Amino acid sequence: MIKFFSTNGHQERVDFKGALLAGQAPDKGLYMPESLPILSQEIIQGFPQMSYHQIAYQVIKPYIGELVAEPALLDMLKDAYSFDVPLERVYDGKYLLRLDRGPTCSFKDFAARLMARLMQYFLKEEGKSIIILTATSGDTGSAVAHAFYGLENIRVIVLFPEKEVTERQRRQMTTLGKNIYPLAVAGKFDDCQAQVKQAFADPDLAGLALSSANSINIGRLLPQAVYYFYAHSRVAPGGEKVVFSVPSGNFGDLMGGLIALKMGLPVKQFVAATNENDEFPLFMQTGRYEPIQPSKNCISNAMNVGHPSNLARLFALYGGQMDESGRVIRQPELSAMREEIYAVSISDEETRQTIKDAYTRHMVLLEPHGAVGWAGLQRYLREFGDWNPAVSLETADPAKFPDEIVRLTGINPPLPPAMASLDEKEENYLRMAGGYASLKEYLMEFF
């Protein structure tokens, strides 16, 4: 069975269940698999005939081993992935992978829904309960809240930066109630994420059975490898190499793709497209990593991350080490990274122009995050020449970002059914000022 180690070097190895329920390693590191299983080409060549949940089983089962019986895991996957995953051809072998058809219209649904089912399975097995503490820059909170909504033995606390989420993103978190507790933080996403990490490391809270549903949790990360295999099976059934362009904020999505690559997926290269928070593209150019503090406010708000947590995993994948503060302890193999990743930073101006161009040229509505990915792909094709097939990830429904889209295209994106009644529901959330001390006081008083 595959064991998981901490990126901060903690010696103890845990199985998938231990890593999933802990969320973060005791030394504040992130869990990474000690080895990555390689899927045979025979298995991968069978994927074009498989459904999404069948592909997911092949990709995820090696990490879980015998911890979940085959029928139970298949049922969870079928239940988690009951929605369509369309590939939209834009032009000449260039596709959009639409990851916005889940219940909260965001790619975060793919990871959150499976993780919720796995956590509930393990908790029921042991008769335990847990508190999920998670930070969001926009879409994670709603996906996690909906995935865990109403589940027994699990309470969910979501921290979000009050002034940096759209009204619809906020309403998706604050209109649920029951076991969901949203907290509006006076600050940025990085502040929310730092408070969550501090809570995990606080000995005073050790009795609370805290876990995370951010992409610091390995249970969020591994399901993200699946949609790369799925997309490849649909656009390159003959096994050709594919270019993937990935809008990148906290870098969980890119890590999912890199894990798929290391598991045997034929990939030409990944485009890591960030917004103006360009700490990673600068690192790829110079070899020096400097977090951006505070992060810059861009219209692709879910990617306003000045120090992406998953860089610790990315560095580990290439033989390096980074601690939770962003300090580089051991440099990764930069030449190997550059062979597999092309990193670009896309300005708000270019993002807006991309939204306009996609609509006028192709009648495609992109929201700001998907536009960053699409702009990154166009930059790649200009620099390295045409490549087919190429897939860019569209990570959220345009209806989540109506203001920019109406202003740029004149089109008011239609509300998907999952969001249609949001405006009528009552909101319920707490405002939290005062940094970590306020969060700690809240946790100790109410939980």
Model-derived features: where do they sit?
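PLP-dependent amino-acid enzyme catalytic core
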Residues: 1-447
